[in-house]
Amino acid sequence: IAISFPMMFSSKSNIKAWAEVLIGFALLFMGLEELKNSVPNLKENTEFLSFLSSYANMGILSTLIFIGVGTILTLVVQSSSAAMALTLVMCYEGYIPFELAAAMVLGENIGTTITANLAALVGNVHAKRAARAHFIFNIFGVIWMIFAFQFFINSIDNYMISNMDLSPVSSVGESVAVPIGLSIFHTTFNILNVLFLVWFVPLISRTVIRMQPSKGEIDEEFHLEHIGAGLMQTTELSVLEAQKEV
């Protein structure tokens, strides 16, 4: 931040843009560090440990349960990025094993589509269709991943053992084994999901058009309901209009 901040006052737009990028990354990692430090020591919480022991060894049912946990977590924090960061921190601290964390990541991919659909409620028909397509895209990705879940977990574990001498499944090596494995899982899942479902884009498009038909020209254009054109003389009324619009 100290290096990037003076660059913000540069007259060149490229330098200012790079300064914003560097400051953004710095704030991101500072936030992750604060999040890691603020997470309580859950290992001393017997109720939490008993919950994990009760639901960690139930096979496919454990996967489904923690997919639901990831979905709910994303809805609560209203951000899949924040939910993913919290999951990574919990993995780093050793609170949850790799398999359950990966299942939570799948749930977070579902949760982020729900928040997008909620945000699209005030949008036009195109925004609503995009939100529906996002939901269909991610939900089908999670469905096919459930069937290949254990294969992916074992493949990532074998890859990391061969190339990094780390094992996220058995937590052999440093404490970063599980977060690294989780990052590989998340990235691989999204790439493969795109490669698989890109061929079904026309079908998804037709489906969301049927799900969200247009109601005419009014529905095609987004417009504010409470805020009119121009600024009002009283700032209190302007704030009130903005609150109603939100």
Language-model segment annotations:
Residues I1, I23-M30, T71-L75, V89-E93, ...:
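Transmembrane helix-bundle signature of multi-pass membrane transporters/permeases
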Residues L22, A127-F140, S167-P202, M211:
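Structural signal for the N-terminal portions of transmembrane helices
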